[in-house]
Amino acid sequence: MTEDKRTNHRVKSFISCTFGPNSDTPRSGTVTSISVLGCFVKTKGWATKGQKMYLRLWLPEGQWLPLQGTVLYHMERVGFGLTFDEISADEEMKIREVVSQARLVQQRPQ
């Protein structure tokens, strides 16, 4: 088993997103886990390790949060892991809110 090198643990999520190699972000997917430092995008779309990616998360308030990141790994026909690049204080605050909300959903009794 490989060692998990994350410094921030991801929480499970279900966030609609769009992504692509430019800000036009033509492909869609679902963020299924997220932390302040990165996320996993579930998609059948292709991504290459090291590729710069534009990502937009659909926030609960009904607006897009545009981010940029670098692909850490790709799992064919499953999705890719992304680390966020140079996020602003405002973007970090919004990501922290998303992570907190996802953590609360996880903790609810089934």
Per-range role (PLM):
Residues W58-Q63:
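Short, charged beta-turn/beta-strand-edge "cap" motif at the junction between a beta-strand
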Residues C39, T70, Q106-P109:
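Alpha-helical membrane-embedding segments
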Residues V31, G69-V71:
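Conserved hydrophobic positions within beta-strands
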Residues L65-L67:
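PAS and PAS-like sensory/regulatory domains
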Residues L55-L57, E92-I95, R108:
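Short alpha-helical linear motifs
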Residues M1-I34, R96-Q110:
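N-terminal helix initiation/capping motif
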Residues H74-A102:
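C-terminal structural segments of small proteins and small subunits
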Residues S13-K49, Y54, G79-G81:
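Short strand-loop-strand
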